[in-house]
Amino acid sequence: MDNVEKELFSQGYEKIVGIDEAGRGPLAGPLVIASVIFPKHQKPFIHTDSKGLSEKEREYLFEKIHDYAEEINITIVENTEIDKFGISNAAKIYMENNLKSLKSKWDIALVDFVKLDESINHLPLIKGDEISHTIAAASIIAKVVRDRIMIEYKEKYPNFSFDKHKGYATKQHYQEIKKFGITPIHRRSFNLGVNDD
């Protein structure tokens, strides 16, 4: 899973950042963006993207990534910002902001197929989290952070099973919306299955 990084290092790049997001599709909660920079000669220890891992495996790798990464940067995009810009624009804007706010001076960003502003030196990769261990690491960080946020929201909104469906468009979630109405963390620009006048 490090062929992309190996190729870029052979071309003379010294510092590569991987960036990814979690929470593009849910009806509620934030979009979480994470970027990760590993030392140049870090041996890959992630062999699949976050979707192919159990929650326990993600939690383990979350800690391991923190142990080995040179820098990790996390951006939380609230549902109000998603409603304001639209999910695709919000992802693009806040990914760019995340990369610009990194403390390290990096050479190129690997992105899981999001085209960023041309002023940012980046390489959009189809299924990037499956072929780049740096993107895969960012994917795991974003997913774990978002899941933890949604578990906390379960305490705040006990009528919603945010600890289980994490805000995604499940049958259970739609039933909860129908019964209890929408919460302040629901994305009003998404189809919530209710008329909100």
Curated annotation (Swiss-Prot):
Acetylation keyword on record: no
UniProt keyword annotations, A-Z: Cytoplasm, Endonuclease, Hydrolase, Manganese, Metal-binding, Nuclease
Subcellular location: Cytoplasm
One of the record's GO cellular component terms: ribonuclease H2 complex
Cofactor(s), names only, from the UniProt record: Mn(2+); Mg(2+)
Annotated GO biological process: DNA replication, removal of RNA primer; mismatch repair
Cytoplasm found in the keyword field: yes
Enzyme class, first EC level, given as a word: hydrolase
Binding positions (a divalent metal cation): D20, E21, D112
Domain RNase H type-2 per the UniProt entry, residue ranges: 14-197
InterPro entries: RNase_HII, RNase_HII/HIII, RNase_HII/HIII_dom, RNaseH-like_sf, RNaseH_sf
Cofactor details (free text): Manganese or magnesium. Binds 1 divalent metal ion per monomer in the absence of substrate. May bind a second metal ion after substrate binding.
Similarity comment text for this entry: Belongs to the RNase HII family.
Name assigned to this protein: Ribonuclease HII
Designated gene of the protein: rnhB
